[in-house]
């Protein structure tokens, strides 16, 4: 049986993992519990939040488990491109990869990550006056400056469709 293993910082990835668990009946575990409970080589669906195109938890979990599919949870549908995620994380070409928009709540971030976002907010405030800003940049700017929660069941539709093709018992 496949298990959903998630790495969450501000709660968005955990919300997606719980939603998918309810919809599919797959067990959901955070990374700390998974490494203690699951036998080495277990089949997992990894849900990891994205920071700088790095899928959190991937490097650690790929050495321990058989990752069947990855859900990369980013700020918006524009914040992480699949090609860039594959390259940055050295993902195999045949690894199923889904990018889920989550949003951001700066108040739930901690330490280094909060500092990075604050620096990005300052940079964005300066760039907002430029006329050559794209729609994608404008959306990311809005999310960073004002926060957003984009977690939704509908974003899991393609993941569910992919899962329905396989028997992971």
PLM features: residue spans?
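N-terminal beta1-alpha1-beta2 submodule of the flavodoxin-like/Rossmannoid cofactor-binding fold
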Residues: 1-64, 161-169
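FMN-binding flavodoxin-like domain, especially the glycine-rich phosphate-binding loop
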Residues: 50-169
